[in-house]
Amino acid sequence: MKVGRNMTNQQQSAAASSDLDLLDRYWRAANYLSVGQIYLLDNPLLREPLRAEHIKPRLLGHWGTTPGLNFIYAHLNRVIRALDLNVLYVCGPGHGGPGMVANTYLEGSYSEIYPNIARDADGLRKLFRQFSFPGGIPSHAAPETPGSIHEGGELGYALVHAYGAALDNPDLVVACVVGDGEAETGPLAASWHSNKFLNPAHDGAVLPILHLNGYKIANPTVLGRMSDSEIRDLFRGFGHEPLFVEGDDPKLMHRIMADALDVAFASIRSIQQHARDGRKNIERPRWPMIVLRSPKGWTGPKEVDGKKVEGFWRAHQVPVASCRENPAHLKVLEDWMRSYEPEKLFDASGALVPELQALAPEGNRRMGANPHANGGLLKKELKLPDFRSFAVEVPQPGAVTGEATRELGRFLRDVIRLNAQERNFRIMGPDETASNRLDAVFETTERVWMEPIEPYDVHLAQDGRVMEVLSEHLCQGWLEGYLLTGRHGFFSCYEAFIHIVDSMFNQHAKWLKVTRHLPWRRPIASLNYLLTSHVWRQDHNGFSHQDPGFVDLVANKKADIVRIYFPPDANTLLWIADHCLRTYNRINVIVAGKQPAPQWLSMQDAATHCDVGIGIWTWAGTEDAGGEPDVVMACAGDVPTLETLAAVDLLRKALPDLNIRVVNVVDLMTLQPQDQHPHGLSDRDFDSLFTRDKPVIFAYHGYPHLIHRLTYNRTNHAGLHVRGFAEEGTTTTPFDMVVLNELDRYHLAIEAIERVPGLATRAAQVKQQLRDKLLEHSRYVREHGEDMPEIRDWVWPGKPG
């Protein structure tokens, strides 16, 4: 709907003209500080004529979006004060970082965190100088920025972060600015459907503010060129009621924006009151949103060098580029900055004048001081059941079969039960919770769903702890927003398709890396991934579903941020899941299978093994006590572990005098040197496991080069021979998948024979028998369409003799 100047407004927070005049001055102050950050080294209040030496040598920053962000921030302040609201500001166009810094400085929250940036002339000088400057602060709404949970550097995730923040925060309103450039991204386009998962009875609200300034870096935006009627139809289709605020006259725009926000917050209040009156079922509401059309680079130079700037893409970054070298440009900049009348905004000391300071909310109501933007302040410890009570009984290694993720599902079911009252734990997944065998969680909760529910639907409810949507972007974004505001969660996904959020993982890892060096940023719960339906058991879906490379990306990140785990069975998975849910400020990646598989370790043995992260399985090897093996058979991952033990079984029977050591790796980062990762083994401990000179046949779940990379500086790296996924795949049998990649028991046993000095000649007949088995396998699967009985029915025989 259009919100006009003449509309009747009886809301509590209706703004008088005098209030709007003050608000305009506040907005001008924010704009002035934003320009100053981009351009000035000195002379922050223009108390002397602007000279070239006052200008930064490198002009960095983005002006175009910033005046719109400042306009929104100032108006939200008015409504927060009038209605005592709890509002979190998510700045989608994070490149408008000068505006976020300016507003938190004006309200005082910035100087409270950074007392060296005082609220006076010297503080202003430091504020300006530090922006996008060596040793200073970044150009975006980075973790260094008070009030930010969203950097907005890589575009696409603002709205989904906002919804994640609103979940289970019934008193919170998340005002989310969506730039019209960001609105063109895939994740943002999908994010509009998040309102189908927001329950107004238990969750907070999200107020999207679509900022149509019409341009990106050098092109118009799609939404910016659409008509109001098209915009209205589009967003009504998404379930919103658009409120249009359009124009370029500040005086008129202040009135229209004030009215629009009054209507929007009244609508939110009405929706929530209706939902919270005790009714059992709620009809999905039509939530309000603001559509703000304002010029890009609003209030800046209209032209520079005879070329259009305001209202065009030339305003995107630095509209006046050569102020040091070009006196005409310097004059344009000075006129521009003086147009804000800084002498009427700041007092003699350089502080914001009292009547403008009074416009900011107080205490934690200031958006820069909202504790939800520093979620560690609000984080409560997750209540966890005793993982040992879910143990699979394993009387002997390999004696029983189990489904690792099914056991994990029972553990997660009880995590949900124990934290039901706190409402601070959610499971996200792209329609895969049941497929990944975690469906025990549905014994205690449902999938949240605000769309109509049919009588024949299964495990759908308006209140649930499981969120499923066929968008890995939304699952990741909801979880990030949830974690950043102080809660806990778990993301289960097919291994191959977690690549869809590679870049989101990157950005979250960068955020965590920076927060490690900001003492005021309290630790948040870790982001926990379960990657299952993995490469070795996607034989039914084929090559498109077979990719274990996500962990390669994870391993690139800072060692104090990432962990990678390959539990070989259910009990190790339970220990690791419990451990990961207790950690903070990390990203934990767990790769585990869901199919029936041999169970190797009792819970006590699993706990001992996982606590170290790597170890010798003495029960599997044949080496003499106190001696060195002839060969080390190492493994990481459930299927590589199975194939390694099957290979050891073949070798034990065929070559009983061969001394074999079996090493299993659960925590992949133990392979790195101790000085590169806190979990890394010392060289001495590494050599004690892998020897200094004996051949090591390493069966690895993923791409082999990662193991070589992690162990590059180890003594015996030259003796390390890694087999893993070789990018061979199709729709075939489970065992044929490992054969195609030469990770099967026969290839592993053959390589062991070839690598032990002198053994290849002595065991030539054994090697030929193993090769014959590979030919037999190939013929059998192509004739029968399933693996040979000796493969399907193989069990670990226990100790020889």
UniProtKB/Swiss-Prot annotation:
Its cofactor is thiamine diphosphate. Transmembrane segments: none annotated. This is Probable phosphoketolase. Its EC number is 4.1.2.-. GO terms for biological process: carbohydrate metabolic process. Keywords: Lyase, Thiamine pyrophosphate. Pfam families: XFP (PF03894), XFP_C (PF09363), XFP_N (PF09364). GO terms for molecular function: aldehyde-lyase activity. PANTHER family: PHOSPHOKETOLASE-RELATED. InterPro entries: Phosphoketolase (IPR023962), THDP-binding (IPR029061), Transketo_C/PFOR_II (IPR009014), Xul5P/Fru6P_PKetolase (IPR005593), Xul5P/Fru6P_PKetolase_C (IPR018969), Xul5P/Fru6P_PKetolase_CS (IPR019790), Xul5P/Fru6P_PKetolase_N (IPR018970), Xul5P/Fru6P_PKetolase_ThDP_BS (IPR019789). PROSITE patterns: PHOSPHOKETOLASE_1, PHOSPHOKETOLASE_2. It is an enzyme of class 4 (lyase). Belongs to the XFP family.
